[in-house]
From Swiss-Prot:
Its job: Probable DNA helicase that may play a role in DNA repair during meiosis.
Residue ranges of the motif Arginine finger: 497-500
Catalytic reaction annotation: ATP + H2O = ADP + phosphate + H(+)
Listed EC numbers: 3.6.4.12
Name under which the protein is recorded: Probable DNA helicase MCM9
Xref: CDD domains: MCM9
Organism from which the protein derives: Oryza sativa subsp. indica
PANTHER family in alphabetical order: DNA HELICASE MCM9, DNA REPLICATION LICENSING FACTOR MCM FAMILY MEMBER
Length: 674
């Protein structure tokens, strides 16, 4: 067993407690008075959150003692908070401000919670990754970041018992040891504070002296994106008690501050017991709403604004400069790069009249021959997303994608799968065709309703999966353009209809295209190409793209204009009336997809209004998914789509094409003539 930390000791305990009282009275008097107010929920435990940075500035010595000996100092802090609470309560009673019958119940359990945000305790030494926690951290105040992968049920455990010595009648309190499975160990002799001591070893339990607490165990795992290739993400069990229980669920991103301890592994015959590390939580902060750790400086935002100010005359040319930063090692594939950008940016989630949430995250599927760059797009998209999970269809089961029920210590718990862990981010599934049909059907609800309903091992619950699904698959055998997409991919119609964009990449013979691509690949490895840094696309590096995508998602909530609404409505009506329409694709989901993609394009163009241009861009993405199209030359095969020299002029020609196809709808014809 590792050597225990030195015991907590101060020269003058009374003086130390008075310093704690001074801190609470100065900074948290209003919080304590608020706790005294009548509570409609009838809670027994009340948190009092203090700021470690504030404490460090007020009294550095107390702050250092709190870091070195959190268990002892937090007990003194709780006692100080209770004294202050009693003092304020007595003052209120003397002032006679309460009406008769308005007496609140006695509030005996106040817990001081330490928030280390913005303090020196966010340094790597006091806030290491889970995989770097060592014995030297034992007993200290530690802050860990991770994702909840397992959440146990709420239990009730004993918090303390009071005993009385049969010899001298001295009363004392005994606390259970969490490290030893909540076992209570009586002292060897009486704890009498008399000079001689009675030496008694026979104790009697005082009736009605047992205090119970809520108790929950969760497990958090370190962020996969921060690990190198081949590294296994480590996990750490966390103990939550009292007001901290049941505030997080599987899939949540959390920051946990607590005391690092250890517990004995379960007793198994002929197996050596070991000490497993665990964190006894003092404060838990959910960071789901703050998923991005990107700190975007004002200078970068000014660069974005200057870029679009310079591109005001030719906005589509500016958009293409951004798109060229996506997978720059792959030549061309304009349609795919545009689709990737729109998928990552996404639309705006809204609630319809019936109260049902309509998702804003689009889904995308790449269907293509081997060697067409599908996996490279998946990996690059994962790098652009602030939170992502990459998996393959062959190595994924329905439980691994959704939620697994695992048994731990005689109790069933839920362990989050890939879609739950990617909540608020991106889930990339390569080799989509390798998944079993049963496993594919389990993600239907996750893709459309963005939840997963679970009924396993007596556990019935619903978890959020607000994630974008980006899949890649190979066609079944030789791709046949005359057959439907469902036949070529062996994917069911209901699953295909959930993908907003389905792009087909066919490696067909094209002498001109092969020559251009080979020249591009060879030029990438020449000294002349390596020395060039004057390209306008150099601005859009991976880091800059991540910041741009995050910024436009947070600051732009585009709304459809009348022109965009009419364009989308006209196109949808024509698709529904077409005699050669694909029934699996031309559903109401197609209309919702058009709206999402148009909103995403408006965000990409740094706007809050969805214009006719955005609607046309969304239509072009949808048309590229079709087997045949009179609007897009590369329909049925997005591999040979390239960036044009004059995209703004090209857009006018596309408008003509869309108007021609929808000539039976008067509005579009009038728009083009104007």
């Amino acid at each position: 067993m590792p050597p225990p930390a030195e015991e907590f000791a101060v020269d003058d305990l009374d003086e130390f407690e008075s310093r704690l009282d001074s801190f609470l009275n100065r900074f948290h008097a209003d919080d304590l008075r608020r706790i005294l107010l009548p509570d409609p929920d009838g809670k027994l435990h009340f948190p009092l959150v203090i700021d470690f940075a504030e404490l460090l500035e007020f009294d550095p010595e107390v702050a250092h003692q709190l870091y070195d000996y959190p268990k002892d100092v937090l007990e003194l802090f709780d006692a100080a908070a209770q004294r202050a609470l009693d003092k304020f309560d007595a003052a209120a009673r003397r002032a006679d401000k309460r009406k008769a019958g308005d007496e609140p119940m006695e509030k005996k359990f106040v817990h001081v919670r330490v928030n280390t945000s913005g303090s020196p305790l966010e340094c790597p030494e006091a806030s290491p990754s889970i995989g770097k926690v060592r014995v030297k951290h034992r007993g200290t105040l530690l802050t860990l970041k991770g994702t909840v992968i397992r959440s146990g049920g709420v239990k009730m455990i004993e918090g303390e018992r009071k005993y009385q010595c049969r010899k001298c009648k001295c009363r004392f309190t005994v606390h259970p040891e969490l490290e030893a499975g909540n076992r209570i160990t009586l002292p060897a002799s009486c704890k009498s504070k008399s000079a001689k001591g009675c030496g008694g070893a026979n104790f009697q339990l005082i009736e009605d002296s047992i205090t119970c607490h809520d108790y929950q165990e969760i497990k958090i795992q370190e962020n996969i994106q921060l690990l190198g290739v081949g590294s296994i993400p480590r996990s750490m069990p966390i103990i939550l008690m009292d007001d901290l229980v049941d505030i997080v669920k599987a899939g949540d991103d959390v920051v946990v501050t607590g005391r690092l301890s250890a517990k004995w592994s379960p007793d198994i015959k002929d197996v050596r017991s070991n000490l497993d590390p665990m964190l006894i939580a003092n404060f838990v902060r959910r960071t789901n709403e703050l998923k991005s750790d990107l700190d975007i400086p004002v200078e970068i935002i000014n660069k974005f604004e200057e870029f679009w100010a310079a591109s005001r005359a030719t906005p589509l040319k500016g958009r293409n400069s951004i798109l060229k930063g996506i997978c720059p090692q792959i030549y061309g594939l304009f349609t795919v790069k545009l689709a990737v950008a729109l998928t990552l940016i996404g639309g705006v989630q809204h609630v319809d009249a019936s109260g049902t949430k309509v998702r804003g995250e689009p889904h995308m599927l790449l269907v293509g021959d081997p060697g067409t760059g599908k996996s490279q797009f998946l990996k690059f998209a994962a790098k652009l997303s602030n939170r992502s999970v990459i998996t393959t269809g062959l190595g994924s089961t329905s439980a691994g994608l959704t939620v697994t029920a695992v048994k731990d210590g005689g109790e069933w718990m839920l362990e989050a799968g890939a879609l739950v862990l990617a909540d608020g981010g991106l889930c990339c599934i390569d080799e989509f065709d390798s998944m079993r049909e049963h496993d594919r059907t389990t993600i239907h609800e996750a893709m459309e309703q963005q939840t997963i309903s679970i009924a396993k091992a007596g556990l019935v619950t619903t978890l959020n999966t607000r994630t974008t699904v980006f899949g890649a698959t190979n066609p079944k055998g030789q791709y046949d353009p005359n057959e439907s997409l469902s036949v070529n991919t062996t994917l069911s119609g209901p699953l295909l209809s959930r993908f907003d964009i389905v792009l087909v990449l066919l490696d067909t013979k094209n002498k001109k295209w092969d020559k251009i691509v080979s020249s591009h690949i060879l030029a990438e490895n020449t000294e002349e190409k390596k020395g060039k840094t004057s390209d306008p696309e150099v601005m859009w590096t991976l880091s800059m793209l991540r910041r741009y995508i995050h910024y436009v998602k947070q600051h732009f909530k585009p709304v459809l204009t009348k022109e965009a609404e009419r364009v989308i409505s006209s196109y949808y009506q024509r698709q529904r009336q077409s005699g050669t329409r694909n029934a699996a694709r031309t559903t109401v989901r197609m209309l919702e997809s058009l709206i999402r993609l148009a909103q995403a394009h408006a965000r990409l163009m740094f706007r809050n209004d969805v214009t006719k241009l955005d609607a046309i861009a969304a239509i072009l993405c949808i048309e590229s998914s079709m087997t045949t199209s009179a609007i897009v030359d590369t329909a049925g095969n997005a591999l040979h789509s390239n960036f044009t020299e004059n995209p703004d002029q090209e857009c006018i020609l596309k408008c003509d094409s869309i108007a021609y196809l929808s000539k039976n709808i008067k509005y579009l014809t009038d728009e083009i003539s104007n």
